[in-house]
Regions:
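Serine-hydrolase catalytic machinery in alpha/beta-hydrolase-like enzymes
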Residues: 4, 11-106, 192-197, 201-202
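Short beta-strand immediately N-terminal to the catalytic nucleophile in serine-hydrolase-like folds
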Residues: 109-112, 137
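Gly/Ala-rich beta-loop-alpha elbow adjacent to hydrolase catalytic centers
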Residues: 112-120
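A conserved short beta-strand
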Residues: 129-141
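Short beta-strand/loop motif that positions the catalytic acidic residue
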Residues: 151, 157-159
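Conserved alpha/beta-hydrolase "acid-adjacent" motif
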Residues: 164-169
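Catalytic histidine neighborhood in serine/cysteine hydrolases
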Residues: 177-192
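Catalytic active-site module of serine/aspartate enzymes centered on a nucleophile-bearing elbow/loop
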Residues: 189-192, 197-226
């Protein structure tokens, strides 16, 4: 039986070099870390990503939600679809986290929504030794392009059963992934999973995926304990 942490530490942080605003939450006895990549038109305050992050905290997984763009960059609509730029921002966040003693040794995963899913996959392909798992919620993994074939991290694609068009794009991207992978379709759910029980299904799929693939190795457990 998993012992749920009773407390968590919340930090409002700034990710260099641009000072992107973020929220880092570290539960008691944390054993893994997940970085979130929000979709177009969203931010670190995404209510759906926040709900997923809080649930992961209950599983003992630390989370970072942060803005992928500066306010000035958000004014240019083209930037929200600039997947290489968004992936670079994830890389900046990973580099910063690796310098934070409280989370530097934790196995790391990425959770991406919409366009953020493509950015997460590109970042995972570029950092195979650091990124250990990826989850996409209502994502556009097809926008990751050639990076799909390079992803080594176990990848879970979650899509709503009523998210017509996006299902097909996920199925096509799924076929291009070569590593450990799974595709879960939530029956009756649309793109933002507002239907009763839909987001809860996303949370359950994501938490179990990260628990399975972000389990610390024996050397990692020793470093975290030491």
């Amino acid at each position: 039986m998993i012992e749920r942490p009773k407390s968590r530490e919340r930090r409002d942080v700034r990710i260099p070099p641009l000072g992107l605003a973020g929220i880092l939450q570290i539960p008691q006895n944390t054993h893994a870390l997940v970085v979130f990549a929000h979709g177009s038109g969203s931010s670190r305050f995404s209510p759906r990503n926040t709900a997923v992050a809080e649930a992961l905290n209950d599983w003992g997984i630390a989370t970072l939600l942060f803005d992928l763009l500066t306010p000035a960059e958000e004014a240019d609509r083209a930037n929200v679809f600039n997947i290489p730029l968004l992936a670079d921002r994830l890389a900046d966040a990973i580099l910063w986290l690796d310098g934070q003693a409280s989370v530097a040794e934790l196995p790391l995963g990425l959770f991406g929504a919409s366009t953020g899913a493509a950015a997460a996959l590109v970042a995972a392909a570029a950092h195979p030794r650091r990124v250990r798992a990826v989850v996409s919620r209502g994502g556009r993994p097809d926008l990751a392009g050639g990076a799909l074939e390079q992803v080594e991290a176990p990848t879970l694609l979650i899509v709503g059963g009523a998210d017509f068009g996006v299902i097909e794009l996920n199925e096509q991207a799924f076929a291009r992934l070569h590593g450990t992978k799974a595709l879960e379709i939530v029956p009756g759910a649309s793109h933002l999973f507002p239907e009763p029980g839909a987001l809860e299904a996303v949370i359950d799929y994501a938490a179990r995926w990260f628990e399975r693939h972000l389990a610390p190795t024996a050397p990692e457990r020793a470093r975290m304990a030491g």
